[in-house]
Regions:
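Short, acidic/charged, Gly/Pro-enriched secondary-structure junctions
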Residues: 69-102
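Helix-start/capping segments and mature chain N-termini
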Residues: 1-77, 105-281
Length: 281
C-alpha cells in the first residue's frame, strides 16, 4: 500500500492516469528516507526541514498544507495501511512536479508519494563482507545541486551495476576534481589516529540527516578530532579505518579498500554512542 497526495492506493499502477503520467513525465525531484520505530518518526524535524530546503533549491511549489503535522499524518497512514505501526520500518517520501513549468506558470504544484517497508536498524556494528573500490567512469556534480538525493541518481545506478558485476560491497564516488565525495550507500568517514575526516558538502556529497548526526556524535566524543575537508583516493589507503554512514545501517565498517584491510575500532565506539542517542530520540 502507498499514499499518493493524501489518498491510499494498493499499488503505484492503481494511481489515476493523470497523476501517473505526471510521475512518469516529470520524474522524482526529491527523495527522503526516514526511520520509524513503533510509530515514532526518528529525527523527523531534521528530515522535514531538509525536504523543504531541497524543494526551495529546485524552485518547487510548496503547498500550504505541507506542514510537519500533515506529512506526519500521511506517514502514519501508510504505516497503518501496511500493518507497520508497531514495527521498525523505513519510510520513503518522494516529491515531484505535477506539471511542466511554463512561461505563465513557472512554479508548478508538487505531488508526493510515500512508501514503507519493514526494516530494523542493526543492534551491532555492521561490517562489510567484501572490499570497496573507486568508481572512475563518471563524476559527481559538485556544489549545492549535488547535495540533493536525486541529483546524481543515474550515475549511482550505473555505479551499482559496476559494483554488482565486479563483486564489490560498495563504490566510492569522486567529483570532477578527483576528490572523494561519498559512497553509493552513504557518507564515508576516514579515521587516522584520533582524527576522523569526511568530505565537505561542497564536494557534492549528499547532505543527509544521518551524516550530520554522526558528525555531532564525533564532535561530542572526547579524544576524537573531527575535520570536514577534501579527501583524495590516496588518503583512503593511508587510513586506519573507514566507515560509511546511512539511514539503513547507521554506521557500517569497511572491510577492505584495495589491498588495505581495516579493523573497526573508532567505528565500534561511535556506533555504540549513536545507537544510544537513536533509542533516546
Amino acid at each position: 500500500m502507498i499514499v499518493f497526495n493524501g489518498s491510499v492506493y494498493s499499488h503505484i499502477n492503481s494511481l489515476p492516469e493523470a497523476e501517473l503520467n505526471g510521475l512518469i513525465n516529470n520524474g522524482v525531484s526529491i527523495e527522503e528516507t526516514i526511520r520509524v520505530e513503533a510509530g515514532k518518526l526518528k529525527f523527523w524535524e531534521l528530515h522535514y526541514f531538509r525536504m523543504m530546503a531541497s524543494m526551495r533549491i529546485l524552485r518547487m511549489g510548496i503547498p500550504m498544507n505541507f506542514t510537519m503535522e500533515y506529512l506526519e499524518e500521511q506517514i502514519h497512514s501508510v504505516l497503518n495501511s501496511n500493518n507497520l505501526s508497531s514495527d521498525s520500518s523505513l519510510v520513503s517520501l518522494s516529491f515531484f512536479s505535477a506539471d511542466q513549468p511554463t512561461r505563465e506558470n513557472s512554479i508548478v504544484s508538487t505531488s508526493f508519494l510515500i512508501k514503507a517497508k519493514a526494516s530494523s536498524i542493526p543492534s551491532t556494528l555492521k561490517i562489510g563482507t567484501r572490499s570497496i573500490e573507486l568508481y572512475k567512469d563518471h563524476w559527481i556534480t559538485k556544489g549545492l545541486y549535488g547535495t540533493l538525493e536525486s541529483s546524481n541518481k543515474r550515475l549511482r545506478t550505473l555505479a551499482s551495476v559496476f559494483a554488482f558485476e565486479n563483486n564489490f560491497d560498495d563504490l566510492i564516488l569522486i567529483n570532477e576534481d578527483k576528490q572523494v565525495t561519498e559512497t553509493l550507500e552513504g557518507a564515508i568517514f576516514s579515521v587516522k589516529g584520533d582524527q576522523i575526516k569526511t568530505a565537505p558538502i561542497t564536494s557534492g556529497c549528499r547532505s543527509s540527516v544521518y551524516r550530520q548526526l554522526i558528525i555531532d556524535v564525533i564532535e561530542k566524543t572526547d579524544g576524537m578530532d573531527f575535520e570536514e575537508g577534501p579527501i583524495s583516493p590516496f588518503d583512503l589507503q593511508k587510513s586506519d579505518e573507514l566507515f560509511v554512514v546511512s539511514v539503513e545501517h547507521g554506521i557500517k565498517s569497511v572491510k577492505q579498500y584495495r589491498k588495505k584491510i581495516f579493523t573497526p575500532s573508532k567505528a565500534e565506539l561511535l556506533f555504540s554512542k549513536f545507537i544510544t542517542s537513536y533509542r533516546l530520540s
